[in-house]
Regions:
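Glycine-rich, basic loop-to-helix element that forms the pyrophosphate-binding segment
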Residues: 228-244, 294-295
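Acidic donor-binding segment of Leloir-type glycosyltransferases
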Residues: 189-227
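Active-site-adjacent helix/loop segment of glycosyltransferases
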Residues: 79-145
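Acidic donor-binding loop at a coil-to-helix junction in glycosyltransferase catalytic cores
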Residues: 63-71, 328-335
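Short aromatic/hydrophobic "clamp" motif used to bind/position activated sugar donors
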Residues: 249
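A recurrent flexible, glycine/aromatic-enriched loop bordering the glycosyltransferase active site
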Residues: 14-18, 23-50, 292-310, 326-328, ...
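N-proximal low-complexity "stem/linker" segments adjacent to membrane-targeting elements
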Residues: 135-191
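Conserved donor NDP-sugar-binding/catalytic core segment of glycosyltransferases
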Residues: 1-24, 257-293
Length: 338
């Protein structure tokens, strides 16, 4: 695991010890749901206590019982079960780690043979015992990859859920940093004009070389324009957060398109699941097929700063975006780790 990433985990009070398979660091090095906080608190996790699992759900292909439980937890997490654990619950699970054969089963089952070969090569080049590695690699060659995102857990009550949060009409601030993209921004603001939820303001931090304040007069929106001389994305977002008293902050990109229920759906999600962040996803191309893993509710394993609603209290607790990431794309990733 990258030493910078380990330092980041320690900064945020996370143990670098995985509560499931160690090999996940090769396929999902930034995935935090397999780690445990070093402080006593409840946390989102892929660990499921043994008393909460049907024995029939366990995969007996694994050699160790720990691996069977870890596999079940990972599978349920991927299918949309919102698992939570606390530090006390998982103190004892480190007694028996999944063996090397179990690790290769896990890789083949969820990522396939190509990733198994990749993992083997990494471990051989990092001076792991070649006899053990090759032996367990070939012992697991019969394992077939599964579609873990098939048959997800659904939340049917969501469709007809009456949101008291929406009924109270809290103020929402839609935050848009922009740079030389007036052509795309026109569509963005037109989409916001069509929103069914009305109590929102639009905060545009315009860093364009040819600043055009008259461009914004065509829109029927509560829109506040700030000309920012510095071309700094995370500074713009932080300045927007500091400039508003809105209870909910909705981050948007200057080249995205959304439906008319975009704001209301984010609020409804926060209300239904009693969560602090509603993390949407962004598709690179209009009309692009949505990945199976994005088609249902689950714990978010990424924070898309172009489509996410955050309670203001979150920033009060953990701070603003780190402006050291100006000029880079990982400002939202670092925020997500926190």
């Amino acid at each position: 695991m990258d030493q910078r990433f380990i330092a980041l985990l320690k900064k945020f009070n996370y143990s670098c010890d995985s509560v499931i398979f160690q090999f996940i660091r090769y396929t999902q090095p930034g995935w935090l749901f397999n780690l445990r906080p070093t402080i006593e608190e409840d946390f989102a996790s892929c660990y499921i206590p043994e008393e909460n699992i049907d024995p029939a759900f366990l995969d007996i292909t694994y050699e160790t019982h720990t691996a069977r439980l870890a596999d079940a937890g990972y599978r349920l997490w991927c299918k949309g079960v919102l698992l939570e654990s606390n530090t006390n619950e998982i103190k004892n699970i480190s007694a028996e780690k999944p063996g090397l054969q179990d690790e290769y089963i896990f890789i083949r089952k969820y990522w396939g043979n190509a990733w198994a070969y990749y993992t083997l090569l990494i471990r051989l080049f990092t001076f792991k015992n070649p006899v053990n590695e090759i032996n367990h690699f070939f012992k697991t060659r019969y394992i077939k990859k599964i579609d873990v995102f098939d048959s997800p857990i659904m939340y049917p009550a969501y469709e007809n859920f009456y949101s008291e949060l929406i009924a109270t009409t809290p103020k929402v601030a839609v935050i848009i940093p922009t740079l030389n993209r007036y052509t795309y921004l026109k569509d963005v603001l037109h989409d916001l004009e069509q929103q069914t939820y009305k109590n929102f303001e639009v905060l545009v931090f315009d860093q364009s070389d040819d600043f055009q304040p008259e461009f914004y007069t065509q829109f029927q929106l509560d829109i506040k324009i700030t000309k920012q001389v510095e071309k700094k994305l995370w500074t713009a977002r932080n300045n927007a957060i500091k400039s508003t008293t809105a209870s909910y902050l909705l981050f948007f990109d200057d080249d995205s398109r959304v439906g008319s229920d975009w704001i209301s759906e984010h609020l409804k999600c926060i209300d239904f699941f009693n969560c602090d962040i509603s993390a949407g996803v962004s598709l690179a191309v209009t009309g692009q097929k949505i990945s199976k893993s994005y088609a249902y509710f689950r714990w978010a394993d990424q924070f898309d700063s172009g489509n996410a609603m955050v309670k203001r209290d979150v920033f009060k607790k953990i701070g603003l975006f780190d402006e050291q990431f100006n000029g880079m794309r990982m400002g939202d990733g670092e925020f997500a780790y926190r």
